[in-house]
Amino acid sequence: LAVSACGEKAETPETPAATEATASETGLPEIVVSDEELAGNPFRQEWTADYGVPPFAEIDDGHYMPATKKAILELRADIDAIVDNPDAPTFENTIVAIDVAGGSLNKVLNVFGNITNTDTNDTLSELEAEIWPMLTREMNAINFNQDLFERVKTVYSQRDRLGLDEQDARLLELVHREFVRNGADLSPEVKTKVAAINEELSGLTTKFGRNLLLSTKAFKIEVTD
């Protein structure tokens, strides 16, 4: 889901000037990213190098936030499409759809996470403080989406008669377990508390990682003959 999936993404509504999702539509903060911001962004292009290696030489710090915003909008559209599907929940239209949702977000975060963990700078540190809490809010919204979880539960309740092979059965088990462990079955009041804890942990984890990296970079050992 999202940060660990890959696949074709649903198109999000666009205007010539910008792509956006409003808070009233999603219950989440509004996100707007312009076509101009995305122009020439390597994360919006197909990577043709062997093994899909990212074009690191073409990526600069200014590419991360626009690409992240666009990918989040695509993730929201993917989730909305699953929830709004008028057909009865099935393994394909619910479990597989969740598994491949938000693949473009994974593309950005794989690079961003590795770079910020190994070769960060002040600009990237500021981006971390914005991007990770933003993603935590998105994941909270997905994990606590009751309509989405009801579809997952429906498929899971039918697992013994779906005729799934070992791999698909494992995927169904993992998706259902992930929702449960992230609090999908909790009461609304407890979900609110968990969401707040998740956001606090996101900020603290980012801060700890940044301090650890700075400490590692500052370390030195003197060797004398």
Descriptions of predicted regions:
Residues 2-5:
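C-terminal motif of bacterial Sec signal peptides marking the signal peptidase cleavage site
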Residues 8-225:
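Zn2+-dependent metallopeptidase catalytic domains
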